[in-house]
Curated annotation (Swiss-Prot):
Function field: Required for the formation of a threonylcarbamoyl group on adenosine at position 37 (t(6)A37) in tRNAs that read codons beginning with adenine. Is involved in the transfer of the threonylcarbamoyl moiety of threonylcarbamoyl-AMP (TC-AMP) to the N6 group of A37, together with TsaE and TsaB. TsaD likely plays a direct catalytic role in this reaction.
Coiled coil stretches, renumbered: none
Cofactor note: Binds 1 Fe(2+) ion per subunit.
Subcellular localization(s) per the UniProt record: Cytoplasm
Organism of derivation: Frankia alni (strain DSM 45986 / CECT 9034 / ACN14a)
Record key words, sorted: Acyltransferase, Cytoplasm, Iron, Metal-binding, Transferase, tRNA processing
Name under which the protein is recorded: tRNA N6-adenosine threonylcarbamoyltransferase
NCBIfam families: gcp_kae1, T6A_TsaD_YgjD
SUPFAM superfamilies on file: Actin-like ATPase domain (SSF53067)
Top-level EC class: transferase
EC number: 2.3.1.234
UniProt GO MF annotations: iron ion binding; N(6)-L-threonylcarbamoyladenine synthase activity
Length: 356
């Protein structure tokens, strides 16, 4: 008998300021749509939760319709619904979770609440091969900076090797960009302004890289302060602004890549995955590639369009869970703004264990 295809999984992402919807089946992206409220937040220099939530309410149904249209499907073709249940902005998450439950109930299909960061880990699945098992993952975004040991993403616990003690890398980019007079969002602005400038012009500190420091723990608050103090102390400096920006960026990516490479070596794991919004940074991608090649490691980074928040990564993770035989999430699952990353799925009815 012919093998029956897996169901079409609709993924919904509303954790911050992007409204993303995508449709995936058997690891293949069928269609997607994305809407952002970034421009509405720019005047405030950061994301305003109430504005983000209202934008999700306005954009979600049109995104569902657009994703279905791009796939040539109808709502009746959807066989499961996956949604980011956390972490993120509470009101923004609530919009997505409520909509996902409504679609799942109306269509009488399974509902899967998933962890936003696990979605980032799955972002490349529709464009590449299955993820190696095990691997070391570096998640770098506006709200999170973590080094993880990842096995089977659908079944195994996710092990934290180290996290940031204060600011996340993306948060540091945004705050320093503001100090340097760059527009919001700061990460892409820093990346653009650093191109062609001297990353060795200024020796900004590399936090927690000393012999006695925790090898996998991050801290970027001190670096942020060091840049701000340098700018304040040198109002008439002859150092070009582009060199200041490039030197700051180099300090961040130097720390990120050095700690990630060390984690791979210490745990004797030959694969490194870098994901999250900061993974779109051109210097991080280049330095990671250079250092992985020198260390004999295999590097995997999603395409830039998959690094920032999107519905594709949530649909891809939902599809992986469905194909792995994971039980649906509890129907009473609520948004979990502070969800800790130790499993890909949230609100599991019966946790799926790896076969012995």
């Amino acid at each position: 008998m012919p093998v029956q295809p897996s169901p079409v999984v609709m993924g919904i992402e509303t954790s911050c300021d992007e409204t993303g919807v995508a449709l995936v089946r058997d690891g293949v992206l069928l269609g997607d749509a994305l809407s952002t409220s970034m421009d509405q937040h720019a005047r405030y220099g950061g994301v305003v939760p109430e504005i983000a939530a209202r934008a999700h309410v306005q954009a979600l149904v049109p995104c569902v319709r657009a994703a279905l249209a791009s796939a040539g499907l109808t709502a009746a073709d959807i066989g499961a619904v996956a949604v980011t249940a956390g972490p993120g902005l509470a009101t923004a998450l609530h919009v997505g979770v409520s909509a996902a439950k409504a679609y799942a109930t109306a269509l009488d299909v399974p509902f899967y609440g998933v962890h936003h960061l696990a979605g980032h880990l799955a972002a490349d699945l529709v464009d590449g091969e299955p993820l190696p098992d095990p691997l070391i993952a570096l998640i770098v975004s506006g709200g999170h900076t973590s080094l993880l040991r990842v096995g089977d993403l659908a079944r195994d616990p996710i092990v934290h090797l180290g996290d940031t003690l204060d600011d996340a890398a993306g948060e540091c980019f945004d705050k320093v960009a503001r100090v340097l007079g760059l527009p919001y969002p700061g990460g892409p602005a820093v990346d653009r302004e650093a191109v062609g400038n001297d990353p060795a012009a200024l020796a900004f500190p590399r936090p927690l890289t000393g012999r006695t420091d925790s090898p996998y723990t991050f801290s970027f608050s001190g670096l942020k302060t060091a840049v701000a103090r340098w700018v304040e102390a040198h109002p008439d400096s002859t150092v070009p602004a582009g060199d200041v920006i490039a030197s700051f960026q180099e300090a961040v990516v130097d720390v990120l890549t050095a700690k990630a490479i060390r984690a791979c070596r210490d745990h004797e794991i030959g694969d490194l995955l870098i994901v999250g919004g900061v993974a779109a940074n051109s210097r991080l991608r280049a330095l990671a590639a250079q250092r992985c090649e020198a260390a004999g490691l295999r590097l995997r980074i999603p395409a830039r369009k998959r690094c920032t928040d999107n519905g594709v990564m949530i649909a891809a993770l939902g599809d992986l869970l469905v194909r792995s035989g994971a039980a649906p999430s509890r129907p009473d699952l609520a948004a979990m703004p502070g969800a800790f990353l130790d499993q890909a799925q949230l609100g599991v009815v019966q946790p799926t264990q790896r076969a012995a």
